Amino acid sequence: MTNPIEVPDVSIRIVEIQREEEVLSCHFGSVSWLVGTGIHLQASRLCWRIPVRRMRWRYYEFPKDGLYMAPDVEDIPVQNDRTGFQGALSSHAFGIAASLLAFFGFAGVGGGCMERHASLLCVLAAKHAETDLIRQAIAGYID
């Protein structure tokens, strides 16, 4: 599947690697162990009603070495405790939001790889059909 979500001018592909460690180490090297845990923690912050760690997660790559993770489910209820926002995001929008929170949270770690991934993911989020919902979900967590 070349473009599993509708994002204008962005080509995204599903990573077919079966093991989390393999795909994360390709993108994040020695700090890869932080990324999966960080994204799952941020996902739990956004959706504390559902055990997101137990969901099946997929890895998505886009040009220029970007990567994000998203659960393989339908819409996910989210709540932002800092702003009071409540809503639902598609799995891709949810994964983008959780990944952004993790990458920004780890800024300064990994020799710039977190910042690079956050920057690329911001471009994707800005072109996503659920841009406003993603922004509302992460508002107050990222300065």
Language-model-detected regions and their locations in the chain:
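Intrinsically disordered, low-complexity segments enriched in small/polar residues
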Residues: 8-9, 27, 64, 135-138
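Polybasic, proline/glycine-rich intrinsically disordered low-complexity segments
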Residues: 76-143
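Amphipathic, interaction-prone secondary-structure segments
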Residues: 32-76
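Short runs of predominantly hydrophobic/aromatic residues within well-ordered alpha helices
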Residues: 20, 56, 93-96
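Short amphipathic alpha-helical segments, especially helix-boundary/capping motifs
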Residues: 18-21, 73-77
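Negatively charged, low-complexity tracts enriched in Asp/Glu with abundant Ser/Thr
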Residues: 4-51
